[in-house]
Swiss-Prot record:
Pfam families (alphabetical): ATP-synt_DE (PF00401), ATP-synt_DE_N (PF02823)
This protein's UniProt keywords: ATP synthesis, Cell membrane, CF(1), Hydrogen ion transport, Ion transport, Membrane, Transport
Domain of life: Bacteria
Residue spans crossing the bilayer: none
SUPFAM superfamilies given in the database record: Epsilon subunit of F1F0-ATP synthase C-terminal domain, Epsilon subunit of F1F0-ATP synthase N-terminal domain
Gene that encodes the chain: atpC
Topological relation to the membrane, as annotated: Peripheral membrane protein
Protein name, UniProt field: ATP synthase epsilon chain
Oligomeric and partner information: F-type ATPases have 2 components, CF(1) - the catalytic core - and CF(0) - the membrane proton channel. CF(1) has five subunits: alpha(3), beta(3), gamma(1), delta(1), epsilon(1). CF(0) has three main subunits: a, b and c.
Record family assignment: Belongs to the ATPase epsilon chain family.
Entry function: Produces ATP from ADP in the presence of a proton gradient across the membrane.
Listed GO CC annotations: plasma membrane; proton-transporting ATP synthase complex
Length: 133
């Protein structure tokens, strides 16, 4: 059995990762999905969260917005609206987004879209958590 699989993380404007890896953990909408070489074919909806993969015994982390994953023939393809490697997350920008979302949530006006503010807060917190890994 092959000891690695090919991981591609693709957003509309560029490919974030395209490499051989030994393990991938995806943030599925129904929970985390662990993918090893030889995994059966799979299509999965992804939630906003942390994608984790291993390469040469090193751990790597990527923030992804919601998207889809396809697993087939030792290849994992992730299609997402946005993705950032942990090392590329702008912590100041993520912190500012968190503060803006917090301010909107504290402002109890009817014209505030609470679901959007909560989603923005959730994204910012995940990005900040991933940036420290």
């Amino acid at each position: 059995m092959e000891q690695s699989l090919h991981l591609e993380i693709i957003s509309p404007d560029h490919t974030i990762v395209s490499d051989r890896v030994t393990y991938v953990n995806l943030p599925g909408v129904n929970g985390e999905l662990g993918i090893l070489p030889g995994h059966i074919p799979l299509m999965a909806a992804l939630d906003i969260g942390k994608l984790h993969y291993q390469q040469d015994s090193k751990n790597y982390y990527v923030f992804i917005s919601a998207g889809f994953a396809e697993v087939s023939n030792n290849k994992v393809t992730v299609l997402t609206e946005a993705a950032e490697k942990a090392s590329e997350i702008d912590v100041a920008r993520a912190q500012a987004a968190k503060e803006r979302a917090k301010a909107r949530l504290l402002k109890a006006e009817e014209d505030i879209d609470m679901a959007r503010a909560e989603a923005a807060m959730h994204r910012a917190i995940i990005r900040l958590n991933i940036s420290s890994l």
